[in-house]
Amino acid sequence: MSRRCEITGVGPMVGHNVSHSNIKTKRRFMPNLTKVTVLSDALGQNVTLRVTNAALRTVDAKGGLDAVLLKARDEVLSPRALKIKRQIKAKLAEQPAA
């Protein structure tokens, strides 16, 4: 399982530890990933995703998983999140416009 957020696509980054004497050694900055279960309003079911805590705050701020997935670019989404996005689009398309 890759260390990559399924919604934002954020992965490990590379940088340096810098000592007091300014000696630089390579290090990796890992994303703060959490396995969460989020309710999809359109599908009416729970979805389990591995996301960063920053992405989880975005889901709360934007008003739910559906809104975040519909606005997200397809390139950054994981295959599982992309499949959920397509299911949400199909479900919303079959509902009558009110």
UniProtKB/Swiss-Prot annotation:
- Any single biological process term in GO: translation
Q: Does the keyword Ribonucleoprotein apply?
A: yes
Record InterPro entries: Ribosomal_bL28 (IPR026569), Ribosomal_bL28/bL31-like_sf (IPR034704), Ribosomal_bL28_bact-type (IPR001383), Ribosomal_bL28_sf (IPR037147)
Listed under GO cellular component are: cytosolic large ribosomal subunit
Q: Which residues cross the membrane?
A: none
Q: Answer whether the UniProt record assigns the keyword Ribonucleoprotein to this protein.
A: yes
Member of which family? Belongs to the bacterial ribosomal protein bL28 family.
Question: Which PANTHER family does the record cross-reference, listed alphabetically?
Answer: 39S RIBOSOMAL PROTEIN L28, MITOCHONDRIAL, LARGE RIBOSOMAL SUBUNIT PROTEIN BL28M
Please state what the protein is called.
Large ribosomal subunit protein bL28
Tell me the organism: Phenylobacterium zucineum (strain HLK1)
Gene name in the database record: rpmB
